[in-house]
């Protein structure tokens, strides 16, 4: 009988690991990474082991998902995904909404938008959807006027009024916090602001309205929507514990969608 014990133990171990799902979820730095680490804790007792994979930019997570290097990602809003699908042909689909993170205006040299100097430099993200989002924020603040009919993806070429003669510098979104010393102001996505040590509520000089179309999403490969790990991932993310974590940690600068 003693000889059977290791065999039985091994079989038990195999059965245990077979019943658990193991997935990799791609995230960007800041709140997306921080929240997903908490989601992983909630998901583990549900039989889902999440390996959180952090990417430093907005381009690689979708490529990694399309290539099969990860099973899901959680870092982008739907307008960005739509642009990526159209431009790069990714077969990726959203399966759940997560959070909304209003974009903020930050500056090392001024404390309100009225003080923005004539001919000053303004940093905006260089990807179409977040760059367009930044321009829409500036229009809502009265600094520029955009041509009608540009939707959610206007470019600097669509600016029809620029009374302060703002000089736009289009930079990688992750680089904008590090470039503040060289700019009069910049529009920065909340995840990169938080990752760089900025507090959106205290350090921004203006914020995008919370009523915006840029709710973030969990994305999987087309055809994986019914995989057995998808619903536990969503349930863990949409749990009361995660909602409480977000409310307590971000104090209103990150908003839940559920």
Regions found by a protein language model. Give the residues of each.
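Short, well-ordered beta-strand elements
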Residues: 21-30, 48-54, 121-122
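Beta->alpha turn/N-cap motifs
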Residues: 30, 54-58, 68, 73-82, ...
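Short helix-initiation/N-cap motifs at beta->coil->alpha
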Residues: 53-63, 150-178
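Pocket-flanking alpha-helical
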Residues: 58-89, 104-106, 111, 131, ...
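Ligand-binding "clamshell"
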Residues: 83-95, 108-110, 182, 187, ...
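A conserved helix-loop-strand patch within extracytoplasmic ligand-binding domains
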Residues: 95-144, 243
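Periplasmic-binding protein-like
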Residues: 97-106, 130-139, 194-258
């Amino acid at each position: 009988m003693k000889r059977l014990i290791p065999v039985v133990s091994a079989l038990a171990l195999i059965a245990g690991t077979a019943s658990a799902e193991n997935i990799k979820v791609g995230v960007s730095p800041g709140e997306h990474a921080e929240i997903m680490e908490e989601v992983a804790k909630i998901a583990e007792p549900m039989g889902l082991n999440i390996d959180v994979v952090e990417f430093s930019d907005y381009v690689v997570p979708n490529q990694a998902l399309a290539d099969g290097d990860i099973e899901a990602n959680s870092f982008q809003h739907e307008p960005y995904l739509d642009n990526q699908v159209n431009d790069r042909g990714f077969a990726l689909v959203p399966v759940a909404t997560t959070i909304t993170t209003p974009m903020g205006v930050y500056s090392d040299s001024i404390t309100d938008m009225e003080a923005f100097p004539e001919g000053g430099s303004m940093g905006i993200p260089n990807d179409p959807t977040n760059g367009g989002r930044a321009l829409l924020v500036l229009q809502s603040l009265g600094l520029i006027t955009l041509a009608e009919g540009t939707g959610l993806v206007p470019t600097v070429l669509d600016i029809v009024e620029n009374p302060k003669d703002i000089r736009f510098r289009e930079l990688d979104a992750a680089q904008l916090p590090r470039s503040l010393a060289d700019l009069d102001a910049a529009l920065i996505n909340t995840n990169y602001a938080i990752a760089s040590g900025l507090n959106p509520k205290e350090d921004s000089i203006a914020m995008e309205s919370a009523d915006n179309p840029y709710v973030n999403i969990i994305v999987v490969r087309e055809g994986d929507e019914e995989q057995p790990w998808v619903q536990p991932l969503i349930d863990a993310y949409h749990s009361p514990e995660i909602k409480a974590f977000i409310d307590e940690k971000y104090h209103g600068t990150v908003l839940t969608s559920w």
